[in-house]
């Protein structure tokens, strides 16, 4: 059965993930290293992991499998999800794929280096309504695609 794992710290689309999951009766694991407001929703499993680098990522990566979806803005976590056969979506709905993850990791490293050397100061553009809409469409499409393929 497909499950959705949300890397919830700084995730702007938690509610949208729950909305799509509810439509399909899927469990959503909202994983964070800080407290969250309880939802009381029967399909939502709120997981609070200890503080520390990559603890939430590790929790997700250890559990996600080939029929699952990982929602994250963390490119290394997306790479780990893909290695396990899971689908991975960014907050803006853009899918991470085997074909794109290498370039995404390289760009992440380049941008970090540019920030460290002072050659780049800002982040990306602000999260927009279009990003939210793209995310909803992409998550729906991903759920449908997983449901159409045979189980591993």
Curated annotation (Swiss-Prot):
Which residues fall in a coiled-coil region? Answer: none
One family from Pfam that matches here is DUF188
Q: Where is the composition biased (Basic and acidic residues)?
A: 128-140
Region Disordered, as annotated, extends over: 114-152
InterPro entries xrefs: UPF0178 (IPR003791)
CDD domains for the chain: PIN_YqxD-like (cd18720)
* Homology family: Belongs to the UPF0178 family.
- Specify the protein name: UPF0178 protein Plav_1521
The species this protein belongs to is: Parvibaculum lavamentivorans (strain DS-1 / DSM 13023 / NCIMB 13966)
